Amino acid sequence: MLLLILSLGACSEEKEGELCFVGDSLVAGWDVKDAFPTWIVRNDGVSGAKLEEIATWNLNYQDKNVVMLIGTNNLGGKLFNDATRQEFITDFVDEYKRTIEGLAPRRVFVISILPRNREIDN
């Protein structure tokens, strides 16, 4: 989070620009207007959202700055199964790339999903 804030602060020519936030409940519950008061912000966070659902939301981020935090709802059995882990990771990364390309942002800031407790998820 600190890295994101520092990165945005370094973009002085973009002050007062627009930031579009997309993600799951972590984004939906984030008071982005308070966190980024000098920016025009849009919060498209949806509780329970999965990465592959973003493409169905018909969002237009062309030439806008996008902050993404999504993916924790995608984690589960395949990631923790030794036989399917590598395939899951490869597919997940590919889906992330396709999603970003589909949004066509000017610039994208991807916030890493939070660690999950393996025992609880199973």
Predicted regions and their residues:
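Alpha-helical cap/lid subdomain in secreted, periplasmic
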Residues: 34-40, 53-122
